């Protein structure tokens, strides 16, 4: 039986880990497979330990999915590198590597749901993400912002970042002082907390969380990977 290994960024916040477990439990039930978490940092198990455990347990077919919102260094280098090393260390494992969530309509739908829940369905928005030195990853955030604006009631949707690049949340809110803040993060943790602090007294919508739409997306990415139908811009991949 194929195993789904969902790789999240990792957080010391137990609530963030619970989001990952809930998503994977639901996706595993939908697919009829064992679905387990692994983390890049700040939580365990690591990708290497998780894959080693699966090999020792006798599993021979694993789909590794980055539960990440864009294709930054984590998915292109950290997770990809771990998969590459595991192929050498555990040649009995067939490893299929999927792509991250990206600027997918399911992500945009959940972002809008969180804004509606916050009473901000028709307000200007600053979409806040983690930020990366990889321009491809930052462009994905910009594409997500554009999709959030298209066909919806938000007058503007701008982007801001809490690490690695700009504009910062403070800079974006200077340009859009009446905007609400939308968190492009899977769950709670250090970076979303940093964004919330930077927002001051402005409305901040909740992170994506364990939304059913994201379960659908995990199932979609799993089937892509298992069918060797992964399509993404990999100019900067390992």
Predicted regions and their residues:
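Active-site-proximal alpha-helix that buttresses catalytic centers in soluble enzyme cores
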Residues: 1-238
């Amino acid at each position: 039986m194929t195993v789904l290994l969902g790789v999240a960024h990792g957080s010391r916040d137990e609530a963030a880990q619970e989001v990952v477990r809930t998503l994977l439990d639901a996706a595993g039930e939908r697919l009829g497979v064992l679905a387990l978490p692994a983390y890049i940092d700040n939580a365990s198990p690591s990708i290497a330990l998780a894959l080693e455990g699966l090999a020792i347990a006798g599993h021979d077919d694993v789909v590794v999915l980055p539960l990440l919102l864009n294709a930054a260094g984590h998915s292109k280098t950290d997770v990809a590198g771990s998969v590459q090393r595991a192929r050498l260390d555990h040649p009995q494992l067939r490893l299929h590597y999927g792509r991250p969530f990206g600027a997918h309509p399911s992500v945009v739908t959940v972002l809008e749901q969180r804004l509606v829940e916050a009473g901000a369905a028709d307000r200007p928005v600053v979409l806040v993400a983690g930020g990366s030195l990889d321009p491809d990853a930052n462009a994905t955030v910009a594409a997500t912002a554009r999709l959030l604006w298209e066909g919806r009631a938000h007058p503007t949707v701008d982007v801001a970042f809490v690490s690695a690049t700009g504009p910062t949340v403070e800079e974006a809110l200077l340009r859009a002082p009446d905007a609400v803040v939308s968190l492009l993060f899977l769950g709670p943790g250090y970076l979303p907390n940093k964004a919330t602090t930077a927002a001051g007294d402005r409305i901040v919508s909740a992170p994506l969380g364990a939304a059913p739409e994201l379960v659908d997306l995990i199932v979609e990415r799993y089937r892509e990977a298992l069918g060797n139908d992964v399509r993404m811009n990999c100019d900067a991949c390992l």
